Amino acid sequence: MSMDHLPIAIVGAGPVGLAAAAHLLERGLAPMVFEAGATAGASIGRWGHVRMFSPWSFNIDAKAAALLAPTGWVAPPADAYPTGRDLLTQYLWPLAEVAPIRQRLHLNSRVVSVSRAGHDVMRTAQRGQAPFVLRVAGPEGERDVLARAVIDASGTYATPNWMGTHGIPALGEMASADRIAYSVPDVLGEARHRYANRRVLVLGSGHSAFNALHDLAELAAAEPRTQVLWAIRGVSLERILGGGKNDQLQERGKLGLVIRRLLDEGKIALHTGVHVDRIADSPEGLRLH
């Protein structure tokens, strides 16, 4: 059975998903883009206050820029470093409004499963020749969509790692979810009231943790009763803080140097070798065991 008449489904309307759509359009293929959020790049809006490590030149796809050019869009300075909000307002949202993209973009449409049409665990013959079937939950309920191919550009921001040691939630973690942020909260902006003059633990050694630590230290400078704690599973920072002045991404290197300085100055209390099995409430706050 020929599948040439079917669209190519793209899951996620972030920078990768819309760039993929631009490339498919340039090749005369028909993309169909599904975005779970209310806007393109919805997950980026959750860290819109964070400045990126990579300049604009790393973040604008050439085929996407070619679609934008006829609209009068002006590319941002190539060597400037955008925030997440900049990425949305100056690039991604304008791209989502370009007619060939807009006509194929389905917002508030979450892909909940992907399978092969007419096949299941027991029926596998010629499975590779069958079209994909996507179960999509949208404003009008669930529907099934057939596609000749699927590009998963959904990202991982909505599915962060659990605090538990075993790759599953720590005991008590789900019950404490209203007191745990699994993103980079805007502690200097809209979330300031939640973190000011509190004892705050950042768990993890990725660059999201670095950004949170940086902002919490700045908050503590203005709100002196704020305490900033940092816990990592490893026992050393040598491979965590980046390449400093020699880092291939200049802004990433700078952030690592700032975190090291804050540690040296005692503005961040570091705890190494931390493995969380259980989280319990107490009069002093959450306790990690």
Feature names for model-found ranges:
Residues 6-32, 205-219:
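N-terminal Rossmann-like FAD-binding beta1-loop-alpha1 element of flavoenzymes
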Residues 152-220, 228:
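Glycine-rich dinucleotide-binding loop and its adjacent helix/turn
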Residues 16, 39, 157, 208, ...:
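Conserved Rossmann-like nucleotide-cofactor binding loop
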Residues 5, 108, 197, 273:
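Phosphate-coordination loops involved in phosphoryl transfer and adenosine-cofactor binding
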Residues 218-289:
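A Rossmann-like FAD-binding core segment of flavoenzymes
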Residues 37-91, 187-189, 228-250:
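Glycine-rich active-site loop/strand segments that organize a redox cofactor
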Residues 74-159, 277-288:
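Feature captures the FAD/FMN-dependent oxidoreductase FAD-binding
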Residues 7, 30, 199, 224-227:
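Residues at the starts of beta-strands that form the adenosine-phosphate
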